[in-house]
């Protein structure tokens, strides 16, 4: 899935204190974009509903000669019974790491790590805000759309790069 995206704001140097103090970013987005916990857990708190994952696809890009260059791309929608599309997420994994750690592709990544009691952390690389006609159609909602991308670490090693785009409807749950 590719989107034409017109960016109206982004930051690639994530200094949480600068974002916390930025009065132009609504509090709800600060919590969602910079939260240290699982978005799945945050969305359940915000919406008072259990989240579900709509697994779109998992695609394997492989190079049999160089297994370390082989990777998996997983795309999902995360939502609730009343709002099926709260977030679009695309994650990129090294095949070995994916097969070793993540055994339930129908489960949200954050939920899996929390239930497994695995210690992980994320390093946010970019937060962005913008408009996209394709996203407006997919989310059935007018923009702008907030998003982020980050690296997920386990035992100090990078295991996944994750891109997330959030529905503007999340602002309605404040």
UniProtKB/Swiss-Prot annotation:
Keywords tagged on the record: Chloroplast, Plastid
Tree of life domain: Eukaryota
Subcellular location: Plastid, Chloroplast
Membrane spanning residue stretches: none
Chief place of localization: plastid
Listed GO CC annotations: chloroplast
UniProt-listed SUPFAM superfamilies: Chorismate lyase-like
Family: Belongs to the ycf21 family.
Name by which UniProt lists this protein: Uncharacterized protein ycf21
Species annotation: Porphyra purpurea (Red seaweed)
């Amino acid at each position: 899935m590719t989107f034409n995206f017109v960016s109206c704001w982004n930051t690639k140097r994530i200094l949480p204190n600068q974002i916390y103090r930025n009065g132009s970013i609504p509090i709800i987005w600060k919590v969602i974009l910079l939260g240290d916990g699982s978005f799945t857990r945050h969305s359940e708190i915000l919406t008072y509903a259990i989240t579900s994952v709509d697994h779109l696809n998992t695609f394997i890009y492989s190079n049999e000669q160089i297994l370390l260059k082989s990777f998996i791309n997983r795309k999902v929608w995360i939502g609730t019974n009343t709002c099926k599309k709260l977030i679009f997420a695309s994650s990129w994994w090294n095949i070995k790491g994916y097969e070793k750690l993540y055994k339930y592709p129908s489960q949200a990544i954050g939920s899996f790590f929390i239930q497994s009691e695995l210690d992980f952390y994320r390093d946010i690389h970019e937060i962005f805000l913008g408009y996209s006609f394709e996203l407006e159609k997919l989310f059935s909602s007018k923009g702008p759309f907030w998003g982020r991308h980050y690296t997920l670490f386990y035992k100090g090693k990078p295991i996944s790069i994750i891109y997330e785009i959030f529905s503007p409807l999340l602002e309605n749950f404040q």
